[in-house]
Regions:
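N-terminal, polar/charged subdomain of small-to-medium soluble alpha/beta proteins
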Residues: 1-128
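Core catalytic alpha/beta fold that binds nucleotide/phospho-ligands
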Residues: 77, 107, 124-205
Length: 205
């Protein structure tokens, strides 16, 4: 469904098929429906072409997996909300300059082959501010900076507080906590952002 513009370098993901809950009617909330996703991501291939190393490009398999997981778990009421969620996910990957995403429901109307929506967004146009609190009392001096660095990979950190030291809550025994907070500018929808945070938490142990 998505029509890729000719100018620039583009990654195309076509007919990614998800099965999820999307719709307003009661019957649409009872069982999953087929959801067809197309996405075109404008990037610059110069560096990855020069080095021939995947790490210098956008991992489109990872983009596909994240869009698929989001579409199958978020349970949006409208395809308009879902398509903007997916656009935000695409723009969260470093190097993506523009994205065109379409979402279609093949069985939305039996008289039409499919009915869908399309959204085009530029990098930075969907950024929102997420206020993130950090805290640890297990290897905190090492883990707190590592967590902040990992979070900076999700978006742009615009503000950071100083580090505060506090005792465990409720008078419990144990090491003191180190705490901080930061403001993160990111296009990610809330559900995808929480999943990224949980992944960082797992990686840090």
């Amino acid at each position: 469904m998505t029509q890729t513009p000719h100018a620039g370098d583009w990654i195309r993901i076509e007919r990614l098929t998800a099965f999820g809950i999307v719709g307003l009617h009661a019957w649409e909330r009872e069982r999953t429906q087929e959801i067809i996703i197309d996405a075109s991501l404008r990037v610059d291939f110069a560096r990855v072409a020069a080095t021939d190393e995947v790490r210098h490009g956008v991992n489109y398999a990872e983009v596909s997996r994240e869009m698929l997981h989001h579409a199958e778990t978020i349970e949006r009421h409208t395809v308009e909300a879902l398509v903007l969620d997916l656009a935000g996910i695409c723009l969260s990957y470093p190097g993506v300059e523009e994205v065109v995403v379409s979402v279609a429901k093949p069985r939305a109307d039996p008289r039409a082959r499919l009915i869908g929506v399309e959204a085009r967004r530029l990098a930075g146009s969907m950024d929102r501010t997420a206020l993130v609190s950090l805290g640890s009392n297990a290897g905190a001096e090492e883990n707190l900076p590592r967590a902040a660095e990992a979070i900076a990979g999700i978006g742009r950190v615009s503000r950071v507080t100083r580090v505060y030291q506090t005792p465990p809550a409720g008078g419990r025994a144990g090491p003191d906590y180190l705490n901080a907070a930061l403001a993160l500018e990111t296009p990610l929808p809330a559900g995808a952002l929480v999943r990224r945070f949980k992944q960082i938490e797992r990686e840090l142990g």
